[in-house]
Amino acid sequence: MDKLKIAEWGEKLKTGGAQMSRMVSEKVKDMLQAPTLESKMVDEATLETLEEPNWGMNMRICAQINNDEFNGTEIVRAIKRKISGKSPVSQRLSLELLEACAMNCEKVFSEVASEKVLDEMVWLIKNGEADSENRKRAFQLIRAWGQSQDLTYLPVFHQTYMSLEGENGLHARGEENSMPGQSSLESLMQRPVPVPPPGSYPVPNQEQALGDDDGLDYNFGNLSIKDKKEQIEITRNSLELLSSMLNTEGKPNHTEDDLTVSLMEKCKQSQPLIQMIIESTTDDEGVLFEALHLNDELQQVLSSYKKPDETEKKASIVEQESSGSKDTGPKPTEQEEQEPVKKTGADDDKKHSEASGSSNKTVKEEKQAVKIELGLSSDEDEK
């Protein structure tokens, strides 16, 4: 009997436990592998001591991926390890970092599909002991990616979403019903703009929030001082990163960079929110001072961003005017153009005749000189 049980257990390990064995081997391999610069950056961006995502760090990671300074595969692998970890804080921050990289880096979606990050997210969703907010957040991302028409070239996203929808339809409907009542800083940032920021994928929840809310005053005035401080911190991180990119030497076309444009749009969206904080804050002078100072910095950076384009337009206008002034002089008529040609021909003929005459005269003089030297008389010459 013991041998039969051992044989049965062996068969179970070969079939049902094959996937678990691969997961264990991958985790052991990751543990034995030396930490890379990419993994260190992900560790720093997903520290358990962070209460909110470090958007400055997240955007810096995206910029370094786009500049090929970081290996996108290593970043995705490090995020995958954090999602499969046990820390709810690290899981939440990893999901936010994953979304930021996917929105701002073209190649990240392919890495997410090839590194089987979706499997870890599905495991997180189905894990009843995991944090409920993290499970919802993972499902939101899979749903948005699965419904996106831009990701049809990667069928794994749609297949994973449909698999979850079929297995747990009640969970999906329950979440859709619960989402409209929630109000987050991310949804508030999207309200002033009728379209999602460039480079982002369509998120149904954001579109629904845009349709239900008419302005910024809906729930923004009820934000606590803590929420206002968080909004100020998020905006400041984006502004600092944008300022550093605009002031980077050796990049004359930085205004055309996709990440720069995305950060600029985020700062534009944040400016009315900061102004609302200024108007609604009456009980905390510290928050009011920070909001006023940040608003001044936003206006300065936004105005400096527009200057290169205006300078280029003025330069092109001046160049057109200068080129136009050169061509405004009167053009010679066809008759005037032909007259110099005729005159030149006449002058050439005259010069030719003079040259021939002078040459004949020179020949005669030479003959006369020869005769004188020989002592020939003029009479003999006449004979």
UniProtKB/Swiss-Prot annotation:
The modification Phosphoserine is found at S377, S378. Ubiquitously expressed. It comes from the Eukaryota. SMART domains: VHS (SM00288). Gene3D superfamilies: 1.20.58.160, 1.25.40.90. GO terms for cellular component: cytoplasm; membrane. SUPFAM superfamilies: ENTH/VHS domain, GAT-like domain. Keywords: Cytoplasm, Membrane, Phosphoprotein, Protein transport, Transport. GO terms for molecular function: phosphatidylinositol binding; ubiquitin binding. Pfam families: GAT, VHS. Binds ubiquitin in vitro. Might contribute to the loading of the ESCRT machinery. This is TOM1-like protein 2. The lineage of its organism: Eukaryota, Viridiplantae, Streptophyta, Embryophyta, Tracheophyta.
